[in-house]
């Protein structure tokens, strides 16, 4: 079973580390080439391209300039501990045991606009470069063109190393599009999390992101290996709804929360 999740814009390079072990990103040369492109962008262009404030644009221009290899524990941090958005709140990797980090390293992959695909213990330096932005590059008009089949190849490699053919897609559509799902050597199951609001069930972004992290955590901490085991997932009050699900899109619903 291979879990795929999105990165986060919110980063944490300050908190104490839950593990000292680390690995190097597998697509670092491609990341370095992207950094060379990004260093040519003015803060004003970054602001327009990413739809962010001047202050954030200045920060990310500085990050592009400061980015350097080799990555070491002194200038970089393990990806699973560096990302701190809603998904990662649900994942709570800072509480993992070493055995759980081992399981995650084999079974979890994080997609990234800059790094392509990251294993949990891969070091990364701070950045902001979302997969969906229109950054012209030698391969085409966007990062989807840039990464091409590389991300799919890496996921297929991870599946082959496991001897498995199951991908659990807990990433956003923006990021999973970069994977080219039709090229995956296996079955892709997409869990969908719906919250009741005023008598109707709908995707509430903040809640859905956190739920993706909670399901990732469940798979890792329980060392799940079979898809049917996922149907018992009940963290946060979600319950599997067989009637609303299809073969490869599994729906989990939660009753309206008080407050």
Curated annotation (Swiss-Prot):
GO terms for cellular component: cytosol. One of its GO terms (biological process) is response to hydroperoxide. InterPro entries: YaaA. Signal peptide: none annotated. Pfam families: H2O2_YaaD. HAMAP family: UPF0246. Belongs to the UPF0246 family. This is UPF0246 protein SG0407.
């Amino acid at each position: 079973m291979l879990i795929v999740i999105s990165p986060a814009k919110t980063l944490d390079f300050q908190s104490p580390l839950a593990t000292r072990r680390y690995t190097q990103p597998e697509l670092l040369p491609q990341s370095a080439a992207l950094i060379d492109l990004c260093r040519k962008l003015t803060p004003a262009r970054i602001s327009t391209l990413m739809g962010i404030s001047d202050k954030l644009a200045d920060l990310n221009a500085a990050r592009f300039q400061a980015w350097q290899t080799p990555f070491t524990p002194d200038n970089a941090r393990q990806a699973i501990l560096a990302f701190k958005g809603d998904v990662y709140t649900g994942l709570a990797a800072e509480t993992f045991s070493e055995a759980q980090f081992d399981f995650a390293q084999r079974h979890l992959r994080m997609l990234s606009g800059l790094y392509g695909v990251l294993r949990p213990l891969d070091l990364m330096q701070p950045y902001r470069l979302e997969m969906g932005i229109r950054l012209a590059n030698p391969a085409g008009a966007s990062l989807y063109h840039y990464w091409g089949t590389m991300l799919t190849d890496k996921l297929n490699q991870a599946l082959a190393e496991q001897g498995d053919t199951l991908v659990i897609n807990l990433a956003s559509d923006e990021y999973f599009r970069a994977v080219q799902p039709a090229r995956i050597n296996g079955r892709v199951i997409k869990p969908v999390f719906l919250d009741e609001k005023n008598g109707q069930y709908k995707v509430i972004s903040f809640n859905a992101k956190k739920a993706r992290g909670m399901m990732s955590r469940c798979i890792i901490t329980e060392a799940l290996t079979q898809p049917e085991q996922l149907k018992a997932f009940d963290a946060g009050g979600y319950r599997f709804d067989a009637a609303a699900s299809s073969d490869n899109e599994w729906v989990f619903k939660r009753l309206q929360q008080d407050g």
